[in-house]
Regions:
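Cytosolic regulatory regions of ion transport systems
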Residues: 1-401
């Protein structure tokens, strides 16, 4: 059997190499100088031949025997590098099947149709279905058992957002009372006159020309106070809108209305694919992510509320409605962080969901860690995106020409 050349030995590339070697296929892997010694050792132990160098260089590809190989699999996380190498391989060796990793699924079909690439695949999209299936593997919690409602933490409110408007309303009401009794105005006229003074747009139909000195001084002070307080209120409103506070509150209110939803922690490529898949199935989703202005955040937000914050904090999980959710999916790119999120969610669930288990699904790169956790606990489902996607890459690479 002709060898398959794998370009890149990152976490995903190593999984592809091990899967190919497990199929009894000869493998040559091109690894650059940044590849860790551990990955090189694991690839060699699996039976792969290793060529050191940059897979974008023709001389390196020639040393790997790419022109005579069965297929070339481009596994790095750089879309540009993968596409550049794929096009060069198509020109150098048209008979070689090219299987390429790319992060934009909407472009993959164009690459296959226009450039003759055998398969352009997005690992996140390939694995999203497995995360969704794991999250939906238990019945929905439509009928929670009667219990004493838990005291949920409230979002802290900045004092100035309450004090300034209250002060403005207080001054406004006091001025109405003063003008009603001192000038003999009716209540509606006092309201009208106070409004014209505070906003400094008086029409002259009512004025303080013949009013007592004390009332005139009060009117002067009211004008200054009105201008100042209105300016401060306008600035606070601008801060409330422009800093994203209004959007955060809107998302939290949307999340508060949801029931039987799935909480997705981490809005990377996998998290976005999982949220998109769930939304497409009509399953309500709440996303937790620490980055507020990320492009993927803006892409996901119209479909589901995004809570900005650290998913390892119970207060953030409560804002996402963890006590009403059917499942939580932790899909960041860090195994330790995913485990911490899962443990925190389990603690919160035990405190706020009596008799209703929370399905916990965690993304995991380390197969040994997954085995250890599954050996001692059934509360957590660990899914390896790399392993699931690697099997698809291998299958496409070994398809008949």
């Amino acid at each position: 059997m002709q060898a398959v050349v794998v370009c890149g030995l990152g976490r995903f590339g190593l999984q592809v190499v091990e899967s190919l070697c497990g199929c009894g296929c000869g493998v040559t892997v091109i690894a650059d100088e940044r590849t860790t010694a551990e990955r090189l050792e694991r690839a060699a132990a699996a039976g792969a031949r290793i060529v050191r160098g940059d897979f974008r260089a023709r001389i390196t590809r020639a040393a790997a025997g790419l022109a005579d190989c069965r297929a070339a699999v481009l596994t790095t996380s750089s879309d540009v590098d993968n596409l550049e190498a794929a096009l060069e391989i198509r020109g150098e060796a048209p008979a070689v099947r090219v299987v390429m990793r790319h992060s934009q699924p909407q472009l993959c079909r164009r690459f296959e149709a226009d450039f003759g690439i055998a398969a352009a695949l997005t690992p996140a999209d390939l694995a999203a279905g497995a995360f969704v299936a794991a999250a939906l593997a238990v019945p929905s919690a439509a009928a929670p058992a009667a219990r004493r409602p838990a005291m949920l933490p409230r979002r802290p409110v900045r004092v100035e957002f309450i004090a300034i408007p209250l002060l403005l309303v207080g001054i406004y009401l006091a001025a109405i009372v003063v003008f009603h009794f001192s000038l003999g105005l009716s209540w509606i006229d006092a309201v009208y006159f106070t409004t014209t003074v505070v906003t400094t747009v008086g029409f002259g139909d009512i004025n303080l020309q013949h009013a007592p000195v004390a009332v005139k001084l009060f009117g002067v002070a009211l004008m200054f106070a009105g201008v100042l307080l209105i300016a401060i209120t306008a600035s606070l409103l601008a801060v409330f809108v422009l800093t994203g506070t209004a959007e955060k509150l809107r998302n939290e209110l949307r999340a508060r209305r949801l029931r039987d939803h799935v909480v997705v922690c981490g809005l990377g490529s996998v998290g976005t694919a999982v949220a998109r898949d769930l939304s497409g199935r009509g399953i309500p989703v709440v996303v937790i992510d620490p980055v507020a202005d990320d492009e993927m955040h803006r892409e996901t937000n119209p479909r589901c509320p995004v809570i900005v914050g650290d998913a390892t904090r119970p207060v953030i999980l409560h804002r996402a409605g963890i006590e009403r959710a059917r499942a939580l999916v932790a899909c960041t790119s860090n195994d330790a962080l995913n485990l911490e999120i899962g443990l925190t969610a389990q603690s919160v669930a035990e405190a706020s969901r009596s008799g209703r288990p929370l399905r916990l699904v965690m993304r995991c790169f380390d197969a040994d860690l997954a085995r250890r956790i599954h050996a001692v606990s059934d509360n957590y489902t660990l899914v390896s995106e790399a392993k699931i996607a690697a099997e698809v890459f291998v299958r496409r690479a070994l398809e008949p020409a």
